Amino acid sequence: MSISLIQPERDLFSYQPYWAECYGTAPFLPMSREEMDILGWDSCDIIVITGDAYVDHPSFGMAIVGRMLEAQGFRVGIIAQPDWTNKHDFMRLGEPNLFFGVTAGNMDSMINRYTADRKLRHDDAYTPDNQSGKRPDRATLVYSQRCKEAYSHVPVLLGGIEASLRRIAHYDYWSDTVRRSVIVDAKADMLVYGNGERPLVEVAHRLAAGEKITDIQDVRNTVVMRKTPLPGWSGVDSTRLDKPGRIEAIPNPYGEDLPCATDDISIPEAKPITVRAAKPKPWEKTYVLLPSYEKVKADKVLYAHTSRILHHETNPGCARALMQKHGDRYIWINPPAIPLSTEEMDSVFALPYQRVPHPSYGKSPIPAYDMIRFSINIMRGCYGGCSFCSITEHEGRIIQSRSEDSIIREIEEIRDKVPGFTGIISDLGGPTANMYMLRCQSPRAEQTCRRASCVYPEICPHMDTNHQPTISLYRRARDLKGIKKILIASGVRYDLAVEDPRYIKELASHHVGGYLKIAPEHTEEGPLSKMMKPGMGSYQRFKELFDTYSKQAGKEQYLIPYFISAHPGTEDKDMVNLALWLKKNRFRLDQVQNFYPSPLANSTTMYYTGKNPLAKVDYKSEEVVVPKGDRQRRLHKALLRYHDPANWPMLRSALEDMGLQHLIGARRECLVPAPTLEEQREARRALRHHTPALTKHTSITRQRQPSNRAPAASAGKKAPTVANGTSSAHSTSANQSTSANQSTSAAHSTLATKKSAGKTGVNKAAVNKPSAGSRGKNRQH
């Protein structure tokens, strides 16, 4: 493999350990004063506040950060899921000598607490006994404020995925508004975004050396508040949609370049010596001035423009700093940190984790731990660039892989030490199962590329697609003594896998437990192009290879595809076509996911602005169709569960509105059955018992006439005929929305019908009819 041009200034473990190293390694990082006393500590140097239960396992952020800082010689305490209603629980371990580290946990607290439909969840997988309500909404903000109440002079550093994805002015789905950077609202001293090992270690050592937090402003992967740019940095003004321009230095009013008065003194002639300085890279010491918080809140196009810039500045090899005004100050976002090397990754995962929850939880189960206790993280990062996912903005595009030896040692440690191990490793993976050791083969391209995805619309020719390192790892792992099975539970990137069929054969032959999950997300080009996902051709090719190799291995195995409904760019006809594809392929999904607009994702920008940040943004640029209303989002979700009888009335109504009545019935190509006689009788019964209507005469009530009956004719006049081409069910619904006037005309009835159809939010576009369905046994878990 070629040597990367993206190199750190110093190794993660090259710092002189802090003096407290003499205390040694703690069995568990202390969560109480009693534990501190046992360790002989009079105080903590650093206290980590987290919204998750403390599990000493490398899949939990607080454990990695805590053990990493402990390895640098610092005394680290943890306050897990504190009582946030007052400051007292935040003073449990006393005042830290250096700083508080605040994180909401492994998940965004709002996503953890609410569903995609903004409904309150009643469980929390990161809490003992799966209890909900153990962390507040916007936990990062609340915890930070309580830390400042407890010890106002102690620096507060924000971290974790919640803070990371809120490092800039961002759209907040739950309040349906644009919020300021979380560092502003939390009144914190610094925000660490992404994986925090490198910046946290540097900041901790600089604070320990006596520097003030206000003087530490230039650390990569951090966000700070400033009134001016960093000294020596030049800026590019991108506050408007026109071509960005350089921010010129303010001229010296005293004219320092003007000639000075001199007496006629002869100066000896000297021959100049020319020394050519190294030409600086165009991104070095350069920042981009973004539209202010106030502007992006008021102008959706500027918001999309800002989002596009931020996503272009994620490559640590060439990213520029970003600067955005909030009121009378600016947030300063330093470029991303240099990724960890394989040796550094090995050292981080070799730290002395106990791999079990803290003893204070007793036997209370923690579902998130139960899910991962026998799994192993083999890499970080993802270059897929899916629009609805924020992994690139958090972990980066560059894959950071552990060595094979490091992974094998962890498997042996699980086998020998973790209670309850039965010989089955539940996962060898990461953000994606099959990106292990796959990096850009061109050092120059890796350093300078600003593409959002290395695999969309086509796989970059510089990208390595040789899966042999992964295959070798799988073979070595399953040959270990005491290991019965190695399963792969992480999602497989199938467009990469088809480039190396050997991997698919290895996977199907040895590492699938009956079902393999993959995520095509949709079948139609419209939404797929906005998601930046490959077309169904790659899926079909992968399925053919998977089925072939499964059959050769004598195994009955199935693919479980995952889909997203109501994603920006999805029209109703797209969801109907997806439902027909599911029916044709005999899939019946048990659980479906509506699009969830999480902070900083490109898809969230589309959802909020109606603009496409994947292309150049201006006031005339592409408008994106966004399914927003509750009714349309429910419809899209219902189409994924076309087989559920509870959804049939809604689907029938929508199909009629779209002019797709031919999809209602008992024929093979139909999506939903026609209403039964009992359902029709129930509908008529409901009409007869609707609420009475008041006339203009007070206290006099009368029933509306059934809407499918012509109004009574006046004496000597012929009753008007109502022309209505819709079905009886739709006509009934439409006519109920007309006024209570008993002499409603045919024109009024027709108008009401059109209005009712317009409220459904559906599109009257043609839908491809499916061919005869396959007889596979695929089904959803």
Swiss-Prot record:
<keyword id="KW-0949">S-adenosyl-L-methionine</keyword>
<dbReference type="InterPro" id="IPR020612">
    <property type="entry name" value="Methylthiotransferase_CS"/>
</dbReference>
<feature type="binding site">
    <location>
        <position position="382"/>
    </location>
    <ligand>
        <name>[4Fe-4S] cluster</name>
    </ligand>
</feature>
<dbReference type="InterPro" id="IPR013704">
    <property type="entry name" value="UPF0313_N"/>
</dbReference>
<comment type="similarity">
    <text>Belongs to the UPF0313 family.</text>
</comment>
<dbReference type="Pfam" id="PF08497">
    <property type="entry name" value="Radical_SAM_N"/>
</dbReference>
<feature type="binding site">
    <location>
        <position position="386"/>
    </location>
    <ligand>
        <name>[4Fe-4S] cluster</name>
    </ligand>
</feature>
<dbReference type="InterPro" id="IPR024560">
    <property type="entry name" value="UPF0313_C"/>
</dbReference>
<dbReference type="InterPro" id="IPR006638">
    <property type="entry name" value="Elp3/MiaA/NifB-like_rSAM"/>
</dbReference>
<dbReference type="Pfam" id="PF11842">
    <property type="entry name" value="DUF3362"/>
</dbReference>
<dbReference type="Pfam" id="PF04055">
    <property type="entry name" value="Radical_SAM"/>
</dbReference>
<feature type="region of interest" description="Disordered">
    <location>
        <begin position="681"/>
        <end position="781"/>
    </location>
</feature>
<feature type="domain" description="Radical SAM core">
    <location>
        <begin position="368"/>
        <end position="646"/>
    </location>
</feature>
<dbReference type="GO" id="GO:0003824">
    <property type="term" value="F:catalytic activity"/>
</dbReference>
<dbReference type="InterPro" id="IPR023404">
    <property type="entry name" value="rSAM_horseshoe"/>
</dbReference>
<dbReference type="InterPro" id="IPR022946">
    <property type="entry name" value="UPF0313"/>
</dbReference>
<feature type="binding site">
    <location>
        <position position="389"/>
    </location>
    <ligand>
        <name>[4Fe-4S] cluster</name>
    </ligand>
</feature>
<keyword id="KW-0004">4Fe-4S</keyword>
<feature type="compositionally biased region" description="Low complexity">
    <location>
        <begin position="726"/>
        <end position="750"/>
    </location>
</feature>
<dbReference type="GO" id="GO:0051539">
    <property type="term" value="F:4 iron, 4 sulfur cluster binding"/>
</dbReference>
<protein>
    <recommendedName>
        <fullName>Putative UPF0313 protein YPO0674/y3502/YP_2990</fullName>
    </recommendedName>
</protein>
<feature type="compositionally biased region" description="Polar residues">
    <location>
        <begin position="696"/>
        <end position="708"/>
    </location>
</feature>
<keyword id="KW-0411">Iron-sulfur</keyword>
<keyword id="KW-0408">Iron</keyword>
<dbReference type="GO" id="GO:0005506">
    <property type="term" value="F:iron ion binding"/>
</dbReference>
<keyword id="KW-0479">Metal-binding</keyword>
<dbReference type="InterPro" id="IPR007197">
    <property type="entry name" value="rSAM"/>
</dbReference>
